[in-house]
Amino acid sequence: MFHLRTCAAKLRPLTASQTVKTFSQNKPAAIRTFQQIRCYSAPVAAEPFLSGTSSNYVEEMYCAWLENPKSVHKSWDIFFRNTNAGAPPGTAYQSPLSLSRSSLATMAHAQSLVEAQPNVDKLVEDHLAVQSLIRAYQIRGHHVAQLDPLGILDADLDSSVPADIISSTDKLGFYGLHESDLDKVFHLPTTTFIGGQEPALPLREIIRRLEMAYCQHIGVEFMFINDLEQCQWIRQKFETPGIMQFTNEEKRTLLARLVRSTRFEEFLQRKWSSEKRFGLEGCEVLIPALKTIIDMSSANGVDYVIMGMPHRGRLNVLANVIRKELEQIFCQFDSKLEAADEGSGDMKYHLGMYHRRINRVTDRNITLSLVANPSHLEAADPVVMGKTKAEQFYCGDTEGKKVMSILLHGDAAFAGQGIVYETFHLSDLPSYTTHGTVHVVVNNQIGFTTDPRMARSSPYPTDVARVVNAPIFHVNSDDPEAVMYVCKVAAEWRNTFHKDVVVDLVCYRRNGHNEMDEPMFTQPLMYKQIRKQKPVLQKYAELLVSQGVVNQPEYEEEISKYDKICEEAFTRSKDEKILHIKHWLDSPWPGFFTLDGQPRSMTCPSTGLEEDVLFHIGKVASSVPVENFTIHGGLSRILKTRRELVTNRTVDWALAEYMAFGSLLKEGIHVRLSGQDVERGTFSHRHHVLHDQNVDKRTCIPMNHLWPNQAPYTVCNSSLSEYGVLGFELGFAMASPNALVLWEAQFGDFNNMAQCIIDQFICPGQAKWVRQNGIVLLLPHGMEGMGPEHSSARPERFLQMCNDDPDVLPDLQEENFDINQLYDCNWIVVNCSTPGNFFHVLRRQILLPFRKPLIVFTPKSLLRHPEARTSFDEMLPGTHFQRVIPENGPAAQDPHKVKRLLFCTGKVYYDLTRERKARNMEEEVAITRIEQLSPFPFDLLLKEAQKYPNAELAWCQEEHKNQGYYDYVKPRLRTTIDRAKPVWYAGRDPAAAPATGNKKTHLTELQRFLDTAFDLDAFKKFS
């Protein structure tokens, strides 16, 4: 009651002529403030309906009254007029003789002057009872809807949920109604559409219509949505009498699509009965469901749909939704076909596809892309979202009206996999939103052999979607027309509100997990029922025949026509001799490769820049390009330091990155940097987004003020997610080769939170799916006494997954050896020791004639190290990325005197040079830095080893022996020198944890391996 009184008081100046829009704009503020302008001085028990959930209803009635006093029942008109006039407690139900303010004091003390209307009290209570009843159906109707085609479902129902809402007259008492009220006519509230054009209905008819709307084959979950307009929109779609009607032509189209879906699976079963195909039997309605969503979206202007789905029904979707040539699908079953493309390939039910065709319903062009995915369920979700975001970005689709995504899920995975939650929480973030995804859950009520009761703690597998206020439409999959209607509404919702929506197809799985599996072991009763279940095609065909929509011969002709199509495609499939995986590309890059998919050249131009370009970028990077913009004093000092560096023709790490990004923007290359806290940088070194200290939320991105016609620069702090965000950025990088897409981990240690994306997509993606990707991973790494969780990006894991052979020396005389190496590798792994080399490797990533993932172990302490500087001279035209940086000190002047050649990578180089100088051993010990670890620079390291004929070889690293680079580098160095010498080790001892958390222990370990590195007798005892 306090809630309503507060709202009424705040809104008292409004008149009935003011619009609902004005009311709704002011209402949230009123609700938030809870500041009473007027309140009753006495208890208000006389108006109990103002408390609890009824207050929401009263607010909605008040909203309608403000717009038009005649739109509500007379009793409400009296109540609102009296309340606005300041009536005392208990008298708001009554009509005062005068509503003038001069009489208010008299009203409070002269009750006898007020005309009594005792029946109004009863009227209000009755109408509130009806409102409670309607609201009960809207909130809980889905719990008693007939959703299970098998009729045995109880796993989705919480035991506390009543078996029905109204099934017997004694339940009416719960709502304050009685059996005698069934034929009484009640005025309908504004929060329901069951009346159609009728403002009032008998209670019996109200209940019947609510049962039809909410308790049949569709269950609607939406009352948790905190937006009145959206709730009203959904109510109108499901409550309006007769709204779910289909024309005969629509029914025939639906039948034809069911024929294709069903007969495709039956054809595969006949031809390859012993092959795994993860068929769609039991949910054949999925195909017409998807086609309906696509049809509706196409009609609303969408011309590109990007899809992601698991293995279940994938071949059917490829054949009947995306329209992949059937012979290309059938030949995948031929075990004798040889693979024409390099790489491992993948199972047929993992492959993706890209196809442009005419939508026959809308007669509009539409592009369909199904993203390839691994068996790791739901892992493709953020990838699809990222690709969708990229396609929207490149075509200027800022509202998602042209490009959209559809994600398919299994019930067990949707509830069980955390990546679903991570992906949902990207859905409305400014730099990640795709303006609404349609989620379709194939809910066959079982996960392999696990019952829902053991697979989730929530009533439905879709409950995770509630966190983003996505409406959830549950539907019985054996009612094809109900499914089609729900899919139409889902597509309309996405087009109207640009928010996520979930369609839960409650179905069953006619076979086991795969066609070779026996489900009766674990679900005997369920599968006894399934064996009796008539296929949905047969049931729907019988229905249409009985309705006279089609006749039996027409139905049989439709079946034979599609069977003939399959047989002809099967015959053509036998002519296929070679299996081309490249025909299954999900993200082609037109114009980037030659027609046969090869790079247009095998060279890489210089990655250096003209000096005036470097100066210009440096000037912008060290200034604020916006007037009247106040920055933090500490940031002013950082920008001053940058200006001094530019004046001295030098760059540090942050400035080198700035120049790499800025120069690519000048060349029309979009740069996108994403990750946790990347705008400022975890180590406060980047500052790509400046914040006005006097105006809240006013920001400036200087990088977008470099050139008049530059490409846009996107830098965005991500949600605190690695798995979801890295998957998203991988998908973004799939869309175009002409973009530098980078994901930075807050610390490299946290990359294993995204291990699935790294292991299943980035590392083997090209081998499995012939799909290149140029994503860049920036992984802060370095042993600096910060403990086991802030020290190691686990380089040993990335290096272990490199695909080169450590025991085979490649042909070092091959033309363009370094470029060919890059082309053949599965990813590039670097650990730069200078800002200049970091600058070059970022630019090389785009200037290469192909794309490979780039893994960069970035430094922490080197960000401000006084020796970690690069002169402009090393960044000018003609300069390149240095795969190896050789010794250039006294040792290189007289190499025959060198007794030990130390190989290292990254930050440890600065520890080694400091120690070498302290020991005065600059002529005896040479230090060579390996900047590119994979592909391994055999050619350059052979020259280094040959340069120092009298030196023993050692690898030095700051990581523990069983971690870091040693196990990767040692066999390759040995192969390089034809095993002529041993390669000794100087570094930390093996350990389980990546680093110690004790500063003293850290320094002790550091000094110990430095002693080993410069003790020229250290390895003699092993010789």
Curated annotation (Swiss-Prot):
Q: Please give the biological process terms from Gene Ontology that the record holds.
A: 2-oxoglutarate metabolic process; cerebellar cortex development; generation of precursor metabolites and energy; glycolytic process; hippocampus development; NADH metabolic process; olfactory bulb mitral cell layer development; pyramidal neuron development
Which of the residues bear the PTM N6-acetyllysine?
Answer: 401, 970
**Major subcellular site:** mitochondrion
Catalysis performed (reactions): N(6)-[(R)-lipoyl]-L-lysyl-[protein] + 2-oxoglutarate + H(+) = N(6)-[(R)-S(8)-succinyldihydrolipoyl]-L-lysyl-[protein] + CO2
> Where is it found, in Gene Ontology cellular component terms?
mitochondrial membrane; mitochondrion; nucleus; oxoglutarate dehydrogenase complex
Cofactor names: thiamine diphosphate; Mg(2+)
UniProt: Mg(2+) binding residues: 411, 444, 446
For the ligand (Ca(2+)), the binding residues are 143, 156, 158
What the protein does?
2-oxoglutarate dehydrogenase (E1o) component of the 2-oxoglutarate dehydrogenase complex (OGDHC). Participates in the first step, rate limiting for the overall conversion of 2-oxoglutarate to succinyl-CoA and CO(2) catalyzed by the whole OGDHC. Catalyzes the irreversible decarboxylation of 2-oxoglutarate (alpha-ketoglutarate) via the thiamine diphosphate (ThDP) cofactor and subsequent transfer of the decarboxylated acyl intermediate on an oxidized dihydrolipoyl group that is covalently amidated to the E2 enzyme (dihydrolipoyllysine-residue succinyltransferase or DLST).
The record's family statement is: Belongs to the alpha-ketoglutarate dehydrogenase family.
Q: How does it assemble?
A: Homodimer. The 2-oxoglutarate dehydrogenase complex is composed of OGDH (2-oxoglutarate dehydrogenase; E1), DLST (dihydrolipoamide succinyltransferase; E2), DLD (dihydrolipoamide dehydrogenase; E3) and the assembly factor KGD4. It contains multiple copies of the three enzymatic components (E1, E2 and E3). In the nucleus, the 2-oxoglutarate dehydrogenase complex associates with KAT2A. Interacts with ABHD11; this interaction maintains the functional lipoylation of the 2-oxoglutarate dehydrogenase complex.
Protein name as catalogued: 2-oxoglutarate dehydrogenase complex component E1
Q: Which organism is it from?
A: Mus musculus
Q: What is the lineage of its organism?
A: Eukaryota, Metazoa, Chordata, Craniata, Vertebrata
Q: Which gene encodes it?
A: Ogdh
